[in-house]
Design a protein with these regions (language model features):
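Conserved beta-strand-loop-alpha-helix junction that forms the acyl-donor binding cleft
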Residues: 113-125
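Conserved N-terminal entry element of GNAT/NAT acetyltransferase domains
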Residues: 1-9, 134, 148-150
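Conserved acetyl-CoA-binding loop of GNAT-fold acetyltransferases
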Residues: 129-139
Length: 150
C-alpha cells in the first residue's frame, strides 16, 4: 500500500466514494453532495495550510482517502474507503501510513488527533482502535477517539 497527498485528479473518485449510500450513513450531512459543492470544498482543502487529504493506493488502484484538518487545537481525522475496498482490513494501515506523511501537526501546537465516530459505525471504530486511537468520551450518538501526535 502507498499513500500520497491528493491532487485535483482525485476529486471525482473522492466525490463518488462520499456519495456512496454506505458512506453517507456515517457523515453528519448524509445528503448527496453536488459536484459544484464538492469542487469548492475539495479545492479549498487542497489549498489550505490547515488541511490535508491523503489518498491510499494498492497495486496502483485508489482505495480510499484520509482527511486531516486542524480544528479546535487538535487535528480532526476522517477516513473513507472506496466501496470495493471496504471490509478487507485496509483501513488502519491506510490511517497509519497517512499519519506518517503528514507535514503539519505538533509543529503548530496540535498535540493530538481526534476522530468523531457514530456509535453504530463499528468498522470505523475498529480501524481507529487498531491504529492506536483511544475512546476519550461519548456524547449523544458520537464517540470521540483521540491519539497523541508523536
Amino acid at each position: 500500500m502507498k499513500v500520497r497527498f491528493a491532487t485535483i485528479e482525485d476529486s471525482n473518485d473522492i466525490l463518488s466514494w462520499r456519495n456512496d449510500s454506505e458512506s453517507r450513513k456515517n457523515f453528519k450531512d448524509s445528503s448527496i453532495i453536488s459536484e459544484a459543492s464538492h469542487k469548492e470544498w475539495f479545492e479549498d482543502k487542497l489549498g489550505s495550510n490547515k488541511a490535508r487529504l491523503v489518498v491510499s493506493e494498492l497495486n496502483k488502484e485508489k482505495i480510499g482517502v484520509t482527511r486531516f484538518e486542524v480544528e479546535d487545537g487538535s487535528i480532526l481525522v476522517s477516513i473513507n474507503l472506496s466501496p470495493h475496498s471496504r471490509g478487507k482490513g485496509y483501513g488502519s494501515k491506510m490511517l497509519l501510513l497517512s499519519e506518517e506523511i503528514l507535514d503539519f501537526g505538533s509543529k503548530e501546537k496540535e498535540d493530538y488527533y481526534r476522530a468523531e465516530i457514530y456509535k453504530d459505525n463499528i468498522a470505523s471504530i475498529k480501524i481507529f482502535e487498531k491504529a492506536g486511537y483511544v475512546l476519550k468520551s461519548s456524547k449523544d450518538n458520537i464517540l470521540l477517539y483521540t491519539k497523541l501526535i508523536k
